[in-house]
From Swiss-Prot:
Oligomeric form and interacting partners: Homomultimerizes to form the nucleocapsid. May bind host exportin-1/XPO1. Binds to viral genomic RNA. Protein-RNA contacts are mediated by a combination of electrostatic interactions between positively charged residues and the phosphate backbone and planar interactions between aromatic side chains and bases.
Record keywords: Capsid protein, Helical capsid protein, Host nucleus, Host-virus interaction, Ribonucleoprotein, RNA-binding, Viral nucleoprotein, Viral penetration into host nucleus, Virion, Virus entry into host cell
Name of this protein: Nucleoprotein
Bipartite nuclear localization signal, short sequence motif: residues: 198-216
Subcellular location field: Virion; Host nucleus
Gene responsible for this protein: NP
SUPFAM superfamilies assigned to the protein according to its UniProt record, in alphabetical order: flu NP-like
Species per Swiss-Prot/TrEMBL record: Influenza A virus (strain A/Duck/Memphis/928/1974 H3N8)
């Protein structure tokens, strides 16, 4: 799976479907983001937002959440059947921020879900355009990945907080489909499976009857998705064991945690896509850009180019640093929360700092925060270079294990070494190599021990000037080998709580 990423052109990596050629893929991705842009413009008209207000990222997020909520079939059905006080199952809304007399004011709006669905379909040639909805989900997921830590969720499932770099996409909804599955990290899949197994342990009927059969199918499908992310035969064989287990229990949980740890060095292939806020696509469409005709790719130069000429604003709390807020959103836009900071800094052209050093909280503003003191500033989302997004995980020498780092899942296909603290990782593998998976475990540990931190990943791959749209002249950066580049170092971010 990893090798495909390098053999196919980056346009083809987008839709996972090998059946379309590059031009068709670029057109269909273009149609998708164009639809998002048209929807956003229409919503701004409905809400009578000024140009400035329409470029406010908080307004964009509210509008995105409204359409996602309007199309959330399962939740809508649940709300119909379990009416709760003060929640109208047919309506959706959120905070919209407007500029009044030199101040920002919050206005809570409410819309019929039916109306939102109508506007969305109208913007998407009458179709449901599920791909566009998933795209918005991935943007929200990437923003969460950059903003929050998942320590508590990791600990609850018996995993180690140091495995945070495996948690990409951990807040994606279940209904995010194949595109969502592609961007989920190994840790995210492991966590979903462990939760499922734990329910089975606690609830006798979980695997039984008609429902149990559906549950079992879902379990096996998730196992296969995770198996597809691993790149070594031993890891895949262990996944087969977990999938085929008659009655999944603690042994399977152990195996899964073992596999998650192994992924710190024997990295899984996880896709990265630059998904931008709806307002960015809206701005481009409003200025007359025809996405479908021009074609678009989420893994090439296009998102970089779009961000070079888009001005997006954000509300800023009194003691926040606007540059730090910009970094947070830049990382979210490029799905770079788990990338090596050396690589991100080089591409962005300004230093990208670890989260522990950021003076900024999340992008969204809570309903009880005081608007009186809110200011707004321009987000600096431009970059110095662009680079192709990867889905390989960066293991060197074709499929063999290579150095991983306790905290990186590469986003950009750019040559670098992946420094890591082997002692820290290997310490987690003492003891238990008996049981049905013993030979696979031994093999995995052997591969990990043979991994060398000085090996170079993405050999010969470089970044490109923004004028080099055909990616003809790679500039291969040289990095300080010793400097470990984890975003989560000295972390003090808030937990992600629904």
């Amino acid at each position: 799976m990893a090798s495909q990423g390098t053999k196919r052109s980056y346009e083809q990596m987008e839709t996972g479907g090998e059946r379309q050629n590059a031009t068709e893929i670029r057109a269909s991705v273009g149609r998708m983001v164009g639809g998002i842009g048209r929807f956003y413009i229409q919503m701004c008209t409905e809400l009578k937002l000024s140009d400035y207000e329409g470029r406010l990222i908080q307004n964009s997020i509210t509008i995105e959440r409204m359409v996602l909520s309007a199309f959330d079939e399962r939740r809508n059905k649940y709300l119909e059947e379990h009416p709760s006080a003060g929640k109208d199952p047919k309506k959706t809304g959120g905070p919209i921020y407007r500029r009044r007399d030199g101040k920002w004011v919050r206005e809570l709006i409410l819309y019929d879900k039916e109306e939102i669905r109508r506007i969305w379909r109208q913007a998407n040639n009458g179709e449901d355009a599920t791909a566009g909805l998933t795209h918005l989900m991935i943007w929200h997921s990437n923003l969460n990945d950059a903003t929050y830590q998942r320590t508590r969720a990791l600990v609850r499932t018996g995993m180690d907080p140091r495995m945070c770099s495996l948690m990409q996409g951990s807040t994606l909804p279940r209904r995010s489909g194949a595109a969502g599955a592609a961007v989920k990290g190994v840790g995210t899949m492991v966590m979903e499976l462990i939760r499922m197994i734990k329910r089975g342990i606690n609830d006798r009927n979980f695997w039984r009857g008609e429902n149990g059969r559906r549950t079992r199918i879902a379990y096996e499908r998730m196992c296969n998705i995770l198996k597809g992310k691993f790149q070594t035969a031993a890891q895949r064989a262990m996944m087969d064991q977990v999938r085929e287990s008659r009655n999944p229990g603690n042994a399977e949980i152990e195996d899964l945690i073992f596999l998650a740890r192994s992924a710190l060095i024997l990295r899984g292939s996880v896709a990265h896509k630059s998904c931008l806020p709806a307002c960015v696509y809206g701005l481009a469409v409003a200025s007359g850009y025809d996405f479908e005709r021009e074609g678009y790719s989420l893994v090439g130069i296009d998102p970089f180019r779009l961000l070079q000429n888009s001005q997006v604003f954000s509300l800023i709390r009194p003691n926040e640093n606007p540059a730090h807020k910009s970094q947070l959103v830049w990382m979210a836009c490029h799905s770079a929360a788990f990338e090596d900071l050396r690589v991100s800094s080089f591409i962005r052209g300004t230093r990208v700092v670890p989260r522990g050093q950021l003076s900024t909280r999340g992008v969204q503003i809570a309903s009880n925060e005081n608007m009186e003191t809110m200011d707004s500033s321009t987000l600096e989302l431009r970059s110095r270079y662009w680079a192709i997004r990867t889905r390989s995980g960066g293991n060197t020498n074709q499929q063999r294990a290579s150095a991983g780092q306790i905290s990186v899942q590469p986003t950009f296909s750019v040559q670098r070494n992946l420094p890591f603290e082997r002692a820290t990782i290997m310490a987690a593998f003492t003891g238990n190599t008996e049981g049905r998976t013993s030979d696979m475990r031994t093999e995995i540990i052997r591969m990990m021990e043979n991994a060398r931190p000085e090996d170079v990943s993405f050999q010969g791959r470089g970044v490109f000037e923004l004028s080099d749209e055909k990616a003809t002249n790679p500039i291969v950066p040289s990095f300080d080998m010793s400097n470990e580049g984890s975003y989560f170092f000295g972390d003090n971010a808030e937990e992600y709580d629904n």
